Amino acid sequence: MNTSRWLTALCLAASMPAYAASAFKPIEMSDAELAELRGRFVMPGRIISFGIVMSTTWTNAAGDTSTVSANMHIDSSTITPQFYVQSTGSVGNGTNRDPGTGTVVGGAGLGSGQGVTQTVRAAGDGNTAYNNVGINVSENGLSPANVAQSGHALMAGGSFTTESAAGRVSVSANNGGVQMAIAAHNNQGNALQQIGGGNVLQGTVLQGNSNFVNNMTQLNVALGNNGLNAGALNCNLDQLKGLRTLGY
């Protein structure tokens, strides 16, 4: 056995992890740097449709239900993007419609958060509340079939209000964003959703008992499968190589 060769091999093997760790030591990127990379590899020509769906449902202890939804779909055939609002409701079979007696205080700064802000504040018993934000990206190269745009057309600066079984529904379009809310009957609480200015807010206040609330906002993006040309690919590869010098 050649002892010197074995010793050389062991020394090389032991040094490789240390060398790799020093060459590819990760560093933390700031929020500003991440913002510069956001969407970098989704070329504008590949996005063939974009849509937003928002919905809020409130069901009280008696089974009374109110649902409000707003949706917008944009593709190559869209002339003027706008939201369409629908509201439905049904009366439950229960008899428990006692007024809520809970009190929720504070929260004045919740509407000034950046990014996605989700809150549930409760002063009752047996309540259930969900806040959901989803992003659905499809790459099949086909735009989703145009859903018949029905309901109330919400113009910029306009609003929509109606009474429903479980509460009063309101939707408004202001300052480049959309806000929807349900103010539940009998002091049971309220639910709010708001999107605009790069921020999403979802909040629920529960002052009664045995309520079920669901807030949902979903962004839908469809990408074409035509791919990137050679120039765009080289540009993206050069950007990735640039990260190598920073430790990636």
From Swiss-Prot:
Function summary: A minor component of the functional amyloid in this bacterium. Upon overexpression of the endogenous six-gene locus (fapA-fapF) in situ, cells form large clumps during liquid growth, make large amounts of biofilm and produce amyloid fibrils. Expression of the 6 gene operon in E.coli strain BL21(DE3) induces flocculation and biofilm formation with copious extracellular fibrils.
Keyword Secreted listed: yes
GO biological process annotation, one example: cell adhesion
Signal peptide: 1-20
Null allele phenotype: Deletion of just fapE in an overexpressing strain yields cells without amyloid fibrils. Deletion of the entire fapA-fapF six-gene locus shows no visible growth phenotype.
Protein's UniProt name: Functional amyloid sbunit FapE
Protein species of origin: Pseudomonas fluorescens
Subcellular location: Fimbrium; Secreted
Gene this protein is translated from: fapE
Main location: other
